[in-house]
Amino acid sequence: DDDDLEGFSE
């Protein structure tokens, strides 16, 4: 779950 960014999941 790399959703620690600003909603950036690619």
Curated annotation (Swiss-Prot):
Q: Which domain of life is it from?
A: Eukaryota
Q: In which tissues is it expressed?
A: Expressed by the venom gland.
Keywords recorded for this protein, A-Z: Secreted, Toxin
Question: Looking at the UniProt record for this protein, which Gene Ontology cellular component terms does it annotate, in alphabetical order?
Answer: extracellular region
Q: Where in the cell is it found?
A: Secreted
List GO molecular-function terms, semicolon-separated.
Answer: toxin activity
Protein name stated in the entry: Toxin To39
Species this protein is from: Tityus obscurus (Amazonian scorpion)
Traced from the root, the source organism's taxonomic lineage reads: Eukaryota, Metazoa, Ecdysozoa, Arthropoda, Chelicerata
